[in-house]
Amino acid sequence: MAGENHQWQGSILYNMLMSAKQTRAAPEAPETRLVDQCWGCSCGDEPGVGREGLLGGRNVALLYRCCFCGKDHPRQGSILYSMLTSAKQTYAAPKAPEATLGPCWGCSCGSDPGVGRAGLPGGRPVALLYRCCFCGEDHPRQGSILYSLLTSSKQTHVAPAAPEARPGGAWWDRSYFAQRPGGKEALPGGRATALLYRCCFCGEDHPQQGSTLYCVPTSTNQAQAAPEERPRAPWWDTSSGALRPVALKSPQVVCEAASAGLLKTLRFVKYLPCFQVLPLDQQLVLVRNCWASLLMLELAQDRLQFETVEVSEPSMLQKILTTRRRETGGNEPLPVPTLQHHLAPPAEARKVPSASQVQAIKCFLSKCWSLNISTKEYAYLKGTVLFNPDVPGLQCVKYIQGLQWGTQQILSEHTRMTHQGPHDRFIELNSTLFLLRFINANVIAELFFRPIIGTVSMDDMMLEMLCTKI
């Protein structure tokens, strides 16, 4: 009857029958197919095809074919549609999944309204849930009353559970926290935690430095175990005894070997044809700048090994007595503790090498020995160090720059022929030269040559060795 045209359509009797039909069909409407179908269409252009009644012979004429989902359901806007949708929302509220109020609490946009989150468990309607543009989750808008209540309550419950948060070990003292919490919403035991931040260095979640949670001590055991967990200081660290003065354990043997290495180094430099064409002043500028680095390469090639011992600095009384002796012309006898080699300078004028400075020298030697550098490779590295166009006071910069570039090209071709594969060998050899930046020329002079040359300057030594035949 729903799809037929009657001659009584529009009459009073026809309207009464149709209104009674709608009243009886309304209670049976929930038995229609209401399982997650399309409830949002508003057209209802096509009437239901072949669906003229429900089970039991009850006629339903308000079912329409949806143009989107292709299913038969009541027309949007009708009384039956409103009753069914309101009943569906009320019935489905307790089954809605729990609102995830976890990771992202920091967004302030709330530009998109909450999608499909009409209430919290228990049927309590919540209209202040917004879709976050960062995390994609639905949570209250920042600045609303609900947001303030939830965040303040969350922080209040976090404080007692803070000692069990993962401290992150050695990265605990970092102050860079660029990322938000990384999915750690709870600690063991079900205690909520929202003040854990993802460290951009170690990737662990721990309290932000400077916060109240960060200042709370983790536990008594951790406070007692902190000195034991601290790693050893590296050689470049100036703390924990790295600046203690040291001296050679066998100075006579080591100083003689270092002097022989310096002679071989200057002999190698002087008889280079490309170095001999330079004026004497330009030769002196280059040698004074790089003699220490060239000597370190020579000592690594000779595989010089040495040991150091810790020495005590001269006391204030020794310094006063030594200064008085210099002022009086040496008439007063020196105390026994201040007796030194006749070529050595006064104690207060010397800068004794420290343990960290000596360790830098040993690290460079160990690096060279681990690479098994050949004689030709040592020669090319010395040429790279010698012809440095960035030396202050150099006049023939273009010429020196060309020599350094040519030396690097020869070294690259040599490593390509002797070591098959990519240029890893060439890169490793040049990386050893970077370690020379941590070695001070004055430390080498004090450690290896001061007991022999006394107060003579190393610059004067370079000039004398360049002008004489060696």
UniProtKB/Swiss-Prot annotation:
A motif (LXXLL motif 2) lies at residues 80-84. This is Nuclear receptor subfamily 0 group B member 1. It holds the Pfam family NR_Repeat. The keyword Cytoplasm applies. The gene is NR0B1. The keyword Coiled coil does not apply. SMART domains: HOLI. It is linked to Adrenal hypoplasia, congenital: A disorder of adrenal gland development characterized by absence of the permanent zone of the adrenal cortex, structural disorganization of the adrenal glands, adrenal insufficiency and profound hormonal deficiencies. AHC patients manifest primary adrenal failure usually in early infancy, and hypogonadotropic hypogonadism leading to absent or incomplete sexual maturation. AHC can be inherited in an X-linked or autosomal recessive pattern. A motif (LXXLL motif 3) lies at residues 146-150.
